[in-house]
Design a protein with these regions (language model features):
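Short amphipathic alpha-helix used as the core "switch/output" element in two-component signaling
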Residues: 60-79, 97
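Active-site beta3 strand of CheY-like receiver
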Residues: 46-52, 56-57
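Short hydrophobic/Thr-rich beta-strand motif most characteristic of the beta2 strand and flanking loop
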Residues: 27-37, 42, 62-63
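C-terminal output helix
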Residues: 93, 107-120
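Two-component/phosphorelay signaling modules centered on CheY-like receiver
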Residues: 13-31
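Non-catalytic signal-transmission and effector/linker regions of two-component phosphorelay proteins
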Residues: 1-7, 13, 20, 37
Length: 126
């Protein structure tokens, strides 16, 4: 098990449960929250290694703007954690925009568990 603290942010409780189950077998601390509004308090201590952040919060939202907003807020921190964005509504333009803004990776739902773990491990080993 890797000694890492990961925060998963998604408004879908089923996604949060699934990610917690998958990731808890590989990483020491998994914190799940359904709203990005909670991120500033969770990141205050600087002990988070990675944030897995959904890009859309709320019914009918598909543009990724919320995820990009919160990516910017995270990267403004003194020592920001790595951020991997995850979405069901991804396209090449959104992925490129996310990476240019500073995301370390971009994952499309539904994900492959093995590929997800490899992506997180790769980012954490940097």
């Amino acid at each position: 098990m890797r000694d890492a603290k990961i925060i998963v942010v998604d408004d879908n409780e089923a996604i949060l449960r699934s990610l917690r189950t998958v990731l808890s077998h590989e990483f020491k601390t998994i914190v799940t929250v359904s709203s990005p509004v909670l991120l500033p308090a969770l990141l205050r201590n600087g002990d988070v290694d990675l944030v897995l952040l959904d890009m859309n919060f709320g019914t009918g939202k598909q543009g990724g703007g919320e995820g990009l907003f919160w990516l910017d807020r995270i990267l403004e921190l003194k020592n920001p954690p790595a951020v991997i964005l995850i979405t069901a509504f991804g396209d090449i333009e959104l992925a490129v925009s996310s990476l240019k803004k500073g995301a370390t990776d971009f994952i499309v739902k539904p994900w492959d568990n093995e590929n997800l773990i490899q992506a997180l491990t790769h980012v954490l080993e940097r």
